[in-house]
């Protein structure tokens, strides 16, 4: 049996295949996922799993160099924004509009759907390198 934190085989596979600057997104349960991206649907019921649980788990497995957030997140969901900043540390944050974020999802290796219902609980993680 796998010993590391991440048990979901589809998510583990995507992360294992990611190279420098590849992107993966985590979204709330309402985020539209484009056909161009692999859908990894973790949503069970409202709120399970949460956006933050999913983000923290992925960060155990994936080195990131940048995150992309919708500009609206800071104003509409300030508590979530502060939690994200706390978890990512000194990682670069790029802000784009929510509409631009939805378009950028087409370039992501996968979009992970959570049970989160907080508005604008969506993020794109850009893979870094461990050296």
Swiss-Prot record:
Keywords: Carbohydrate metabolism, Cytoplasm, Isomerase
Gene Ontology cellular-component annotations: cytosol
Catalytic activity: beta-D-ribopyranose = beta-D-ribofuranose
Entry's Gene Ontology BP terms: D-ribose catabolic process
Residues binding substrate, per UniProt: 28, 98, 120-122
Main location, first listed in the record: cytoplasm
Enzyme Commission designation: 5.4.99.62
Listed Pfam families: RbsD_FucU
A molecular function (GO) term: D-ribose pyranase activity
Subcellular location(s) of the protein: Cytoplasm
Role this protein plays: Catalyzes the interconversion of beta-pyran and beta-furan forms of D-ribose.
Family: Belongs to the RbsD / FucU family. RbsD subfamily.
Description of how the protein assembles with itself and partners: Homodecamer.
Name of protein: D-ribose pyranase
Taxonomic path: Bacteria, Bacillati, Bacillota, Clostridia, Eubacteriales
Gene from which this protein is expressed: rbsD
